[in-house]
Amino acid sequence: MSLIDIQNLTIKNTSEKSLIKGIDLKIYNQQINALIGESGAGKSLIAKALLEYLPFDLTCTYDSYQFDGENVSRLSQYYGHTIGYIYQNYAESFNDHTKLGKQLTAIYRKHYKSCKEEALSKIDKALSWVNLQSKDILNKYSFQLSGGQLERVYIASVLMLKPKLIIADEPVASLDALNGNQVMDLLQHIVLEHGQTLFIITHNLSHVLKYCQYIYVLKEGQIIERGNINHFKYEHLHPYTERLIKYRTQLKRDYYD
């Protein structure tokens, strides 16, 4: 069963050039779904379209869009407590003039009615998931942390809300191998043990082959291959997909990807 089902998704720029070309996409419930492809293929555009985060100079159309079996009219009502978004510009999520403990508490209490002590308990638990301790984080400002630490705080801020769906755009790209693998293990755990759903965009094909159950391959704005993990491990693949998996490249991203 799919949690998100969008049909004939098309994204165009101001010159009417199609950047995403009429794709059908399902994000399967309680699975790790992946979208792979080279830089410039349009992967991040798809994530932003699903979240209604596209830049103003791009237009998005589709024939139908359902979330959890219901037609989507205003997706913003689901943000935070139902849909979490992990994206690369994590530093933008925190300001520099308020301590992180106060910011994280405000985020939690925005979505859940709770006292400060309960919020701090949930924050402490989420920070421990990403190998951080509250005593090292909550009394600091964002600029006092390294990029890797701040990214893990950001991931914790999404996970603490326990959203039904997490859309993650290169969630561990800025982390070292040890912490990156730990975060991926955590994301796999919340899907397998807690029934959450993950849609991940990544260039790390080793992670895709290790963690994901369903995979989409995007090339020049079109989905050229899709299937479960067994299809990608054991069946004949599109030549483009074979090339991606063979080299397992970590490619730089351009503005729209």
Curated annotation (Swiss-Prot):
It is found in: Cell membrane. It catalyses: Ni(2+)(out) + ATP + H2O = Ni(2+)(in) + ADP + phosphate + H(+). Its EC number is 7.2.2.11. ATP binds at G37, E38, S39, G40, A41, G42, K43, S44. GO terms for molecular function: ABC-type nickel transporter activity; ATP binding; ATP hydrolysis activity. Its main location: membrane. It is a peripheral membrane protein. GO terms for cellular component: plasma membrane. Part of the ABC transporter complex NikABCDE (Opp2) involved in nickel import. Probably responsible for energy coupling to the transport system. Belongs to the ABC transporter superfamily. The complex is composed of two ATP-binding proteins (NikD and NikE), two transmembrane proteins (NikB and NikC) and a solute-binding protein (NikA). This is Nickel import system ATP-binding protein NikD. The gene is nikD.
